Amino acid sequence: MQDASEPVINMPALPMNSVNEQHDRHEDLPEVGTTSVTKIINDSDNEDDENGMDLGRVASESLEGDAVVSIDINTEDSSLSPAKQENEKSPEGIEQKYQEEDLKDDKKSNETIATPVPDAASRASLEKQKSGLTNLEKSTHVVLIKCIEQLIQIKVCMKNEKMKNLMEQLKPLLQTECQFDKFLIVELFQYCFESSQDEVMNISLDTISKLASFAYFSSKDKTPASFGPPKSLLQCMVDMVCDSINDEVVDGNLQLNVVKALSAFILCSEQDSMLHGAILLNSVRKLFNVFLLGDSDTIQSVAQASLTQAVTVVYERLRASHTQSNSTSALPEEDASVTENWVHDEDEPDKKITLHSMASAGTSSLDHVKVDADDPAVTSVENSSIQDAFLVFRSMCRLAVRQTSPDKVSNIRSQAMRAKLISLHLIYRILEKNSDLFMDPTLQFRGIPALKGMTLVHASRQYICLVLSRNAVSPVPQVFEVCCDIFYLMVFSLRAHFKQEIEVFFREVYFPMLDLKNTSYNQKLHTLLIIQRICLNPRALVELYINYDCDRSSTTNVFEQLLFSISKVTTNGPSETISEDIEEILPSLESSERSSTPFLNTNSASLKSEVVQLTTFSDFQLKLKTLQCVLDILQSLSNWAESGLYLSRRGVSTDEQGFVGDYDALSRSDTPVTNPYYNGKQSFEANSHSSSSIALADPSQFESNKQRKKLLRTCINKFNYKPTRGLKMLSENEYVDINDPKAIAEFLFRADGIDKTTLGDYLGEGDEKSISVMHEFIDCLSFINLKFVDALRRLLQCFRLPGEAQKIDRIMLKFSERYMKENPSAFANADTAYILAYSIILLNTDLHSPRIKNKMTKEDFIKNNRGINDGADLDEDYLGFVYDDILKNEIAMKDDQELAAIAPLMNNFSTSSGFTTFTSNGRDLQRVACIQASEEMANKATSVLKKLLYQQKHGSQKTNVYYNATHFEHIGPMLEATWMPILAALSNPLQNSDYVNELNMCLDGFQLVVRIACLFDLDLIRDAFIKTLTNFTNLHSTSEIKLRNTMVIKTLLRIASTEGNNLKDSWKDILTIISQLERVQLIGVGVDETEVPDVINARVRRKNVNIGSSNSIRHVSGSTSRSTRTRSLSKPLSPEAVSELMSTEVVLSIDRIFTQTSSLSGSAIVSFFKALCEVSWDEITSSSDLEQPRLYSLQKLVEISYYNMQRIRVEWSSIWNVLGRFFNMVGSDENRHVAVFALDSLRQLSMHFLEIEELSLFSFQKEFLKPFEYVMASDTVVEVKELVLQCVKQMIQAKISKIKSGWKTLFGVFTFAAKARSEILISMTFDTLVNLFSEHYDTLMQQNCLIDMLISFTELCKNGTNQKISLQSLEIIREVYSSLSTMIKEGLSSKPSVNETFSKYVFPVLFAYYDIIMSAEDLEVRSRALQNLFYIFLEESDDFTEETWEVVSRKFIFPIFSIFGPEADEATVMLRDEEIRTWQSTTLVEALRSLVTLLTRRFDKLHNLLKGYLWLFSNCICRDNITLSRIGTNCMQQLLSGNAYRFEVKDWNLVADMFIELFKETTPHQLLLLETFSNGQGAPVYSENENTQLSHKRGGSLPETSRSISTSSISPEKQMEFRSMIRKCILQLLLISIVAELLDNEEVFNHIPHEHVLKITVAIYDSWQFARKFNEDKSLRITLLNVGFMKQLPNLLRQETASALLYITLLFRLLKTRDPLGKTETDQKIHKLLFPVCAEMLDMYASLVVEKHTRNHAAWQPVIATILDSILNLPLELFSENIHTLYFSCCSMIAKENLDDQLRELLKNYFNRVGHILLNLNAQQE
């Protein structure tokens, strides 16, 4: 029994037209059939009527779980199955059972009264008999007669005269079957109810229920005027039944009969007898009250079942009427006037949305709209049905949101809580069974103007939100659970209409439920259950992502946050061992979808009052449930992706996938793919909106939005850290114009995530820009008609006031200005507002700061604010009101208040986690605090929803578009956004747990993540998850391998088998694990661990080899290695681990991985080979110190090569790029065993490759044979190289006909072998090459192997190890050329071009000879090669064209002398000094001589190359080697003298230019620069006797003191520079001698033009002037001596005299050969160049003092003698013309002491001739 003190919940009789406004779309769900709840008790004449089955007994038996035996209508089975018995324990089960019993009892009743009761359709078709009554009417008369007879037997009825008379009047009428007024029956029942006798009322109610089932009372029949206000008989009877019992405790049978009667009225299917509007609500209200106040649990259960049945019938009628009207009616147009009319705070239109906005909603203006009774649409069946459905739903919502006092909340069995629960359950049932009706856009209100065009979901939207916001955070488990179910329906079926609301509930309710520490176990568990059901829906997950995470207007990334919240539960789980059996936990973790409504009677077992305490066991349950959620998410994503890929492969476009998905189990389409949605309203303008929807339907557009949203978050975070940088970043990314303060202010005002403290500091800054932004920011607020304190509160909610007084001052100044602008009459001026605002801020700090002990009083506050209103005082009452307001309600940020409110849920109250068990003894403070925190969360949720709906009402319709999921491409970005929390959730159990089921869940999750990552090429994610798995294998520490590690290994093997095509670089980790696994298997069978080193640890050691940590370094050999291995054996491998790792499953899995490589794609097999090569190399290097290294992976590498032998050439080319490099390394490995195995494997593979015809094409043979060449070129041991040659020889012998492109590589092997220093290798190579030349020459020529063969023989010639083989190889090259010559001559008939013949046949042989000449180690070989080369040039070059000779000269002849060219590296020349000397003395001499012979013989064709050859000779002449210079001189002279007659003018011009250039390049001009020889400080070094030295005249010697002076240190650079100058001086002398000798040759002098001789003479004159200038600079020469470059005083006397002598000799010779009296320009030029210089030389010689310049005197004497002799030999005319130039110079010679006799004789002759000439002249004159 219920406590009588508890208030009865009376549901008000709401008007029929009371409705709400919302509009949304529908979604099809299966229809639910109608079942009967009430059992109609027949009162036939037999005794069974009185002893019939009672409703209460049936319900009671059903509630207690007893099996109720019923007879099926078809009498096929009289027993109930266990499943059916279980179903009858629920209200739905009772409904079904009652329906069966109703049918059975109706059948009995009809048989008793012999008048069958037809159904509605039959009754409508019956024809009245002529007697005037139908069979149905006769049946009703029987029931009425029975009732009257029972009433007559009751004394109370007979005492009532009116009632007695009425019964006596009615009975005959009923018996005679005459027509009568039905109001008489109503009047009879009225008398019965007025009697207040239970017996009478029970009979009446029983009769009424039967009449109602016969549709006896109609809404068309009206009561007479005398009865009161006119109303229908149907309403009159329903009111009587409802009023028959009150809210006090009454007889249980009477309550049951009332329930039965009301159920009969509600279930009546006749159109005129259906209940609508207020009548229906009145009936439902009475059923609701009976459920609450029922006399027993049985009555409450029956009332609950009847109430459920009534609600179900209302919606079934709506479905039926809509289905019927849909066939004839068209889709109505949406009424644009439909808007939402919640009561909003109009003063805060822009306030941030919080969760408090829903529950604080007031009444809707649509609750009192009037129905237009004249509109025919109002009276239609469909319109009546939709109104009934809405009214019932709204009533349930209103009952569900009623506030409940805390003491009632603690009593779950109280009327208030039971009323809330039944309401919530009915709401859930309505939404679950009829969601398609709610969303059907064709089902709209039509008869009510205010509701016209609305759908059910539109009208009910605010009520659904209100219900959830008020109850979603309830601490009562039952309430929270059903709210979770309702929210799931919102997400599952209605998410397109509740886009923003879903985000709010996730953000404000369900995410905090998982994140906060102290939410109860029940709340966390049911939240996870609902999330799990959402996770099972792939489309819902994808739509959550694209509509929230990819929506730039959404503040919450729902999908991403969902994974983060789930992962927190997983990672925060218990670490201690669970004592309970894990198998007991698993059944409780199933996803519980609500299948039936539980009984909610007072003593129901489903009403438990306690909240389950969180324990280690329950924490573990939550952890498992969280893992299951993660697994379901991954499975859904995988299914969606695979389904989309499957459809795309079938050619189905992405736009069609949403429709095809309806037939695909993997992508179930629970969201209809129709039109886009805006603000929850479907757009009927399909054409206008489809374009924008399609534009954003591209996955790349969603990802662009996602990235843009992420970038905005980054910018805001940057602003929160550094405002100026954040604004700059926002401007750079075009979020805001940094030059527009208004734009910045609006962005800061509306953007989410802005740190309010940072914002306050920025707005308070004193710079001009910040002040402008602050002004615009405050202007965004509206203070119209707001109280001053409220306006200040609104301002300070936008940002946190900075602490600096100047910043506060600036903000308050602007605030006061803004407030007074919008409220000009508030104060006298803005100064008043400014001072008061500042005063209020100080007051708020004073009153609420815990640091201030002496608080400000009201009087102090009033006193402080006197005279601020323009000199006047503000009203004291007003200031007192302000003081009280601040005292009671602190000005604080709402965020701080909300955080403080939910603090009990964030912090642990005690050491135990979660809630403590609520006890009945006293008030639990923890429980109260948590309830208050939950209430605060609910308030926040309702506030958010309120503001959300306000924004939807006043915002743009197209700002909130809901997109359906149609693309599988979203899955990749979804995983990218959430892989980190997924990894955290899945990794934690692998580290700590030993439970198989939990581990299996985690490993399944890993597999799914890798699968998705592989599908979308997410390399980072794939590698991260696979590396995580490899870390959990523990194969690097065999003693620690446990069951979970073996499970991880098996998972990795499964991943390798299933995802091989997409693993890419992750193959390395998997194959490393396989290698480690093979190592563990060997250890398990008894192999010493030291013989199988650990690959992973070895790799770590190599990586950390430079780190000095002893823990990370292990030496490869020595005692350290042995001791380390010994320690690793301290803990042997467990037998269980060995058994698992050596199981058949593992072995077959490994084999399957390798055998399945043949089915991998082209790119995947390359990745596999690459990874296996790396692992194999790790094995080899880790065991390099062992005699038998690990070759497991190398063996597998060869094995899979055989598996994949049938792949096409393109794929093998890619594979061999990897495999070839690997064989290069292993083939040249230091360990002989490794190299031998690799080479033998390579030989076998090569044999197979050669057999494949396709691989012989192009260059693949060359590639797969490359490792042989690489090994031969490496520094490996000779034995390995011998093996290479043997392998190559075997392949040639066995497969020579198959070798095509591989010849190039094979000859490469021979080439590198020919370079070896081993005579064995050289001998093997020579024998093989000779055999190929002699036996297979034609084959090699066909394969174009001439060049390769010549290169091999060339290398043998160059190798000086075996001279005999070198000379034999050289002879073979000669034979090759001979055969080529014969072939060329025989092929002349085809007339190939000379250039083609040369390049194809001759050029390779010439290059071979050239290479031998330049590089051969043996001089004999060089000489013979040179002879052979020039033999070809001299004897076999008749067909060479000038172009051919040009090529030969530039490619072969000139490079022979290039080592001495200016481009040669001096250091190289110095290092090869010995070789050069040998070369110069042998080969080069012979080459130069042969070259002269060649030029002489082939001068006609080489004429154009003369310049190059002259350069070649000059280059040899200019070397510092005297021998080479002389040879060059001789060759030059021989060339010029022997071919002078062939030279043309241009050729002589080249010769002259050559000599001029040589003189110029070899002149050391730097020698004349004094700073060149400075001591490093910019000043030359002089001796202390410098003045004395400088006073000496030309040619004087230095005193001894100067030689004893210490010299400065000379740098190597200075020394090298001076040596270079000395070499140039020597070259000058050599050039002078060359020119002299060359021009002494009469053949040359006669053919060289005189103009070119003059050019050479000018160069010689410059050389003379340079030497003269140096010799005259005494100070420079002394400097050179002091610095230390020379041991004696340097001079250039030889150069000076030699050049002077050559100069005058050439000029006198030119004069001699020309006309003495010639007047040509050349003659005049010779005269000018000769005679003045002669006079100058004579004067210089005359000035020399013999005693001081003895050396100079002697050197110049031949020059002077030559001058005088040549003058004397001049013709008379020329002699006479130049007497005036030379006479005085000769006179000065007479005065010279110790003059040589020769010179004296020459002077004598000169003066004699002069005298004769002068005397003859005088004589002639006389």
UniProtKB/Swiss-Prot annotation:
Region described as HDS1 domain: spans on this chain: 898-1106
GO MF entries: guanyl-nucleotide exchange factor activity
Translocase keyword on record: no
Region feature Disordered, mapped onto this chain: 1-54, 66-126, 1111-1131, 1584-1610
Motif (HUS box): 547-551
One Pfam family linked to the record: Sec7-like_HDS
Modified residues (Phosphoserine): 44, 122, 125, 653, 669, 1110, 1606, 1609
GO biological process: endoplasmic reticulum to Golgi vesicle-mediated transport; intracellular protein transport; regulation of ARF protein signal transduction
Disulphide linkage map: none
SMART domains, alphabetized: Sec7
Role played: Guanine exchange factor that acts as an activator of arf1 at the trans-Golgi net-work and is thus involved in vesicular budding and traffic between compartments of the Golgi apparatus. Activation of Arf (ADP-ribosylation factor) GTPases is essential for vesicle formation via recruitment of cargo adapters and coat proteins necessary for Golgi trafficking. Involved in the resistance to tamoxifen (TAM), an anticancer drug used to treat estrogen receptor (ER)-positive breast cancer.
Protein name (Swiss-Prot/TrEMBL): ADP-ribosylation factor guanine nucleotide-exchange factor sec72
